[in-house]
UniProtKB/Swiss-Prot annotation:
Residues 510-540, 579-633, 647-693 are annotated as: Disordered. Residues 624-633, 647-683 have a biased composition (Low complexity). Catalyzes the formation of the signaling molecule cAMP in response to G-protein signaling. Its main location: membrane. The gene is Ac76E. It catalyses: ATP = 3',5'-cyclic AMP + diphosphate. It is an enzyme of class 4 (lyase). Belongs to the adenylyl cyclase class-4/guanylyl cyclase family. Residues 232-828, 1045-1307 are cytoplasmic. Pfam families: AC_N, Guanylate_cyc. Glycans are attached at residues 934, 941, 948, 1019. This is Adenylate cyclase type 2.
Amino acid sequence: MVNHNAETAKTGNGTNATANLIVKADGNATQPKAMTSSAARMNDALSASLADLSEQENGTTAEDIHLNDLYTRYRQRLRKSLFRSGLLTSLLACVVSIIIGIVYGQHLVQTMLLVLAALISGSILTALQFPAVLSSPAAALAFAIVTTFSLGTIAAITGDELAPLPMYALFLCIHSMLPISWPVSVVLALFMTAIHIVYRIGTSPDYAPNLPMLFGEIVMLASASVSGLYYRIMSDAAHNRTVDGTRTGIEQRVKLECEREQQEQLLLSVIPAYIAAEVKRSIMLKMADACQRAGGQASTSATRFHELHVQRHTNVTILFADIVNFTPLSSSLTASDLVKTLNDLFGRFDQIAQENQCLRIKILGDCYYCVSGLPISRPQHATNCVNMGLQMIDAIRHVREATGINVDMRIGIHTGNVLCGVLGLRKWQFDVWSDDVTLANHMESGGVAGRVHITKQTLDFLGDKFEVEQGEGGNRDAYLADHKVESYLIVPPKPAYTYSVPRVVECIEQNDPSPTTEETKEIKETDQSHEATDVADVLLPVTVAPPPAIVDEKMSPTSINSQEAPLHAPLASAASMSIKELSEEEDEADEATAVTEPLMHRDQDGKNDKEPKANGGHRGSGDSAASESVAKSAALSLPADDLLSMSGSESGISNSGAQAQSSNPASVTPTAAAPAGGAASNSLTVAEAPERSRRKLSVQGLMSFADRRRSSGAFIEGRKLSIHSGESFRSHAGHVTRNRPSSKMTKYVECWGADRPFANIAESKLVKNIGLASIAMIESNLLPPERKCFNFNFFGPPTELKPFTMWYRNTPREAMYRAQPDTHFRFDLICAFVLFLSLAVVQLIVIELNLALLGSLLASFVSLALFLYLSNMSVPDVHASTTERNGPGQVVASSRYLRLAMFVVVNILISSCAVFSVINYTVPDGVSKEPSSNQTILESNFSSVFVNSTLEDVQLWEIDYAIPIAPVFLYCCAISLAAISAFLRSGFILKLIAMLVAVIAQVTVLGYSDLFEMYNDANITHGLPLEIKGFLLLLVIILVLHTLDRQGEYVARTDFLWKAKLKVEQEEVETMRGINKILLENILPAHVATHFLHLERSTELYHESYSCVAVMFASIPNYKEFYDETDVNKQGLECLRLLNEIICDFDKLLLKPKFSGIEKIKTIASTYMCASGLRPGKEDGATDEKRTEEHNVVILVEFAIALMSILDSINRESFQRFRLRIGLNHGPVIAGVIGAQKPQYDIWSNTVNVASRMDSCGVMGRLQTTENTAKILMTAGYECECRGLTYVKGKGNLVTYFVKTPFDGKL
């Protein structure tokens, strides 16, 4: 079984590579110093993954083996405890017998035999204190045989006329207490029966035993076997049900827990943990209030406003980043390529953010913004953001250089205070608000492409860590000029020592085979004979790993961009870059697309609008630490088969260049860089294969690729890296296959290996090995602990069960336990009926027929048969509904009081039958009870005596004749006690009381009978009377039966307790699961959340294409005039509270069945974005597309009018004058989820961009739409007013329409 905290990977030669890979429980991975080869890490991870899969395949067999072993050990442990109890009982009985024998002058031989029996019991009991004694079946069988034969023989010899009574107790022990199988117990019982028969024959005069008495004793011992086997069968069945039921419950519990954990991970991937905890607390309070209202109690938390989950944080730094010229690129990508490119690109930014302790907030179009200092205050928040900005610029620079696409980053940073949290009731997205956020947004707008633009406040926190120059942001942004913001530009740190090698690196899909050595050589020869002329085949710099001393050195996040940064800095580090940055800086004034701007994020005039084209991605928190550790401590080491002789220039690849030093596998001799316009002469040549296998190279962004794929679960099949073997750059016969720039962009960013959304939701080992996990939990919670004698903790945990009564300390739980239906009560009645028949057979064989005997047996038989018929008339079904539980058997099984009444009646009848016929042997008054006075009668012929004697003489003769059968009544008493114990679920205390009452009453009746009085006078000259001796032996039987009853009660109660705890825990998990489901549906569409919760699909990128979707943006432009940060409104918190009320009321409309087809996408400050027509799953290709198109548009217009009505109502209540400005459009869209740290569901397309522009260039109080959408609305009966040609930013002049609503012209 794989350890949850560590995995041992297999090396190539089959030996264990200890410390090769350590995976911590929280997902973080650390790399040992001895393991710096990335290729070896990939091989090790692949081996470990295959080992996991192999173990999972073998899990079923191992699970069955473990379960069978657990069940065997469970029964053996219980049987072992019973064995100890039986030995203790025999030891106690022998000690009491020895004491009585000494007091009454018992024969020395019998006393010595009893001493021997006590020694045997004590010795075996002592030996059992060692756990290894009964570890083997042979040892258990040996102890069982020794115990049985020794105690049985001694009981037969010392028992005299009552020998069957101790034998009865022994038979019960053989079948129910000895640690042997039931066939062995049956064989032992037969042997002991044979020994008893031989002993009876041997001790009889002239070897002629009283055959009726002998047959009666045999039947009695057979009834003991019936009783013992019944207890064993039922207890084994109960144990089996306990193990199976507990296992099922635990498996369900584990599955629910794992599902809840996945939902929790999914939830925490979107919103911070403290926000999620606060929201859960609010939901639980609402659930509690709902329960109180349902119970008729008054609500305790009535409030007029919705819960506001927003907090204020001071001293944080906000970073806004915009990708320059990304819109033309995204418009040329397919749906899958767009989602993949966005996920990889913004996923890389998320990785950089996490490495620099920044929290990404949201992605708006190609605008990416994050904050450092949330939710945990960090002193280095300003430094973190600047470092992140520099690394983002470096990352996008390599995209530009590798693909030839002119993209860049413009970054603005400001330090101040923020309000952060979530607004509304549905589709939460963590966001920040404040005037400082607005300023940071304008710092980006007024920034310079390829530079980090900061304010004076940020510079004050930076100190002298970075060199700056005047930013003059006011010349590029009016907001900065109006507020007289002093800005600066960070001077990029100088590159450290790097060696640029012209390379093109591509990622091959996981199912593509890796190139063989021959293929690699062929590719190398082809590349050496041709020159690449495509401008896109640019040079990809390769950083050579430093010596091991530098590799092992740890870096701080702030040292990445310093001039002294180590050579092995990651891709985004400025220290690893050596190619000259392109100097072109694009002006964004004519950027093609934009969306409605967020309050305090974008200007409302549309100048700096950003469209919602992309949402970022980030790896899980646990995985990022692993990636960061690998990126800072190791370089990528390619396998020998993949290493090529590397050198080249701008025009192609050649084998000329400086030879690598063979003395140091990590060293490379660089050559001088060629002048601009000439061929670059930097080269790196790899020597022989053994030498190449030790060569360490660092390809940007790829050295943590393996660890990220392994941690995200996508590394199972292995992802191959190939140089010059990709689909786009494979050379054939002197031709070079070229891709579009957008395709190259997709291929390049894919090599970064950014995690898929929700990649942290990986199948845990608890789910993989759920059977073994449940068995382990059963073993730790259900298997009784090993105990020593007199350790009463075995009889129940003191915290849950009372030590002697074993009743639950929790009264309601005790009531629940007693109210359980007993579906096996009918089997108890059957066993009691069989024991009654045994009692009747004994009496009919031994006792002469008389009216009292026949009457008692017949009455009891009829009553028991009636009870048996009623309880078996219809099979009880506890799963049936209440109305279906009308059969007699179901009523009996369900009614505890009815079962109790039947228990009392049955046992009174059986106990009475055991002694009732003794009344037939009563000496008439005035007649002497001395047997000697009637000697002549006894010696004469019965017929002549009957003729010549009086009636009194005849009765006295009958009594004298029946004197030898007196012990039979005690045998019948033993059978009646077993019948009482046969009712397994009636409570061991109740049965103990019933047995004691019955035996006392029976012995009292027998003791006062003339038969026993005459027997004592005739056969006992010294010692205890027969009834007293029988009473003591019956007490031994009671003690044995009580031990069995107590054990059965203990097992039943612990099973019920464990299941009750499981049920409570399961309900708690169900509650949290329900809460998480509510939260998930408030964040992602239900079908999207279901998609990512399926483990086999959790690593896939989710995207859907729709041909006709209506998109709407509804903003409140004059809300920014209302927002103000003063002490009166708690620095803007109360302003956000009103906005939260507005959005919550908007969200409530989505709960109406009429608007169930509308999906809220997100809110951007005071802008509400939603869409209609996003059906779950792939588009179903509706036959009536025109009708579907019309429905999507019309329902969204009705929703817009409902929004206007809601806002108008809020205005009247809050004395405000808010107005909606709505933009509407319809057409094809792409829906998908991107990002790993905080995945976002979003939609992209020109349809979305135009809908956003319809809002931003619209008029307050009006609903503006495009011409095509207006035509559909007019066909549906809506009146539209043509606005004419309207300038739309990025689209030129478009004909737009206003849809008339009841709120047009309303102030």
